Amino acid sequence: MLPWKHALRTLSVLLLTAAATLAPTASAQAAAAPSRGWNDFSCKPSASHPRPVVLVHGTFGNSVDNWLALAPYLVNRGYCVFSLDYGQLPNVPFFHGLGPIEKSAEQLDVYVDKVLAATGAAEADLVGHSQGGMMPRHYIKFLGGAEKVNALVGIAPDNHGTTLLGLTKLLPYFPGVEKFISANTPGLADQIAGSPFITRLNEGGDTVPGVTYTVITTKYDEVVTPYRSGFLDGPNVTNIVIQDKCALDLSEHVAIGTLDRITFHEVTNALDPVRATPTTCASVIG
């Protein structure tokens, strides 16, 4: 094999492998099972938690696997919780978030309307992991979501794209790779730092008035790099590094969104700031 072809294949594998780490570690078979305790469209928000919470999975995720820990955590605290699948590709079961992100935002638009109609609420709160923390910003900014969303909580979101530890900067040196990614997994191409999608998303400001934004990151993120690129700039933004709450928290990109109860506690603080309590290492047992 010619050296450049070997390098091309290696880079392709590295890119897809790095992107695959966005997937939760739970078995994909769980996606075939119904969610328990959430996605209950008979749930009516309470006076203490008047808005339904919509969970938005990350790349290679789905509406069940991504939320096997966080959804019950929120349900047990009195929230009406819902989750959707989006960004599906033909003949690719379980692993979603791979389609064009603009189309995924349209799917979110339809789903939020469905949740609001079922619950009778005027607004929803959105909590997303990785792409799921970034994609709703397109919905809020361009599809009228600002009128329907009170708060967006992004867990390790790639709000300004990612370099995948610098790998994406090598794409111009390998003819065909970028075209291959765009054609086969447009949702990945959209997340590359400097992509047309990311550029348009952030033009004119990161945020929209009337929506509260919270970003929770980890300094051990190996997918959204640099990790502070997930931060947003705006008067209605709280940017958090989870290690500032607990220096012992070693969560990386996947764990922070799927397993980390310290992060979960910070999510509830963002959803209900009036009743917020300090997040510490002890929050893991809260």
Predicted regions and their residues:
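Second-shell loop/turn segments in exported
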Residues: G58-G61, P93-G99, P186-L188, S251-G257
